[in-house]
Amino acid sequence: MKTQRDGHSLGRWSLVLLLLGLVMPLAIIAQVLSYKEAVLRAIDGINQRSSDANLYRLLDLDPRPTMDGDPDTPKPVSFTVKETVCPRTTQQSPEDCDFKKDGLVKRCMGTVTLNQARGSFDISCDKDNKRFALLGDFFRKSKEKIGKEFKRIVQRIKDFLRNLVPRTES
């Protein structure tokens, strides 16, 4: 025979299961990293694999591309890191380190997943060689100056030729 006590017990279990059902999706959502958190995790991996003396820290994060909602699908990322003053052997977070004056800058591209439990990344970084950028600026400015000078020379030749043509007196 069923007692009132059994009814309360069944009601409690139902309530526990209902609450558990409501909390589980929140736990799953909490395991999804934000775009920036996934990039910071990738930078931690870059620092672990690096043979450079100092840690790198996020300098610039390109805007987040439009993405699907699946946290297991690799998402494209691109960002720039800069060398900090903290040695790689330190246990300090790169975010707590100051950038090194004239520190090495690297441009990084690849993919990250936002699933915290199975988070992965495939990132490659190249030195952001400012010398080549400066060389490009030099050639662009030189081209502009040469173009202006060329136009000036052409105008002087035209003026000279106009003056050579015999003038008729009226």
Curated annotation (Swiss-Prot):
One of its GO terms (molecular function) is lipopolysaccharide binding. Changing Q155A: No impact on antimicrobial activity against M.luteus. The keyword Disulfide bond applies. Changing I157A: Loss of antimicrobial activity against M.luteus. Antimicrobial protein that is an integral component of the innate immune system. Binds to bacterial lipopolysaccharides (LPS). Acts via neutrophil N-formyl peptide receptors to enhance the release of CXCL2. Postsecretory processing generates multiple cathelicidin antimicrobial peptides with various lengths which act as a topical antimicrobial defense in sweat on skin. The unprocessed precursor form, cathelicidin antimicrobial peptide, inhibits the growth of Gram-negative E.coli and E.aerogenes with efficiencies comparable to that of the mature peptide LL-37 (in vitro). This is Cathelicidin antimicrobial peptide. The N-terminus is blocked. Proteolytically cleaved by proteinase PRTN3 into antibacterial peptide LL-37. Proteolytically cleaved by cathepsin CTSG and neutrophil elastase ELANE. Its main location: secreted. The keyword NAD does not apply. It is found in: Secreted; Vesicle. Residues 150-162 are annotated as: Active core.
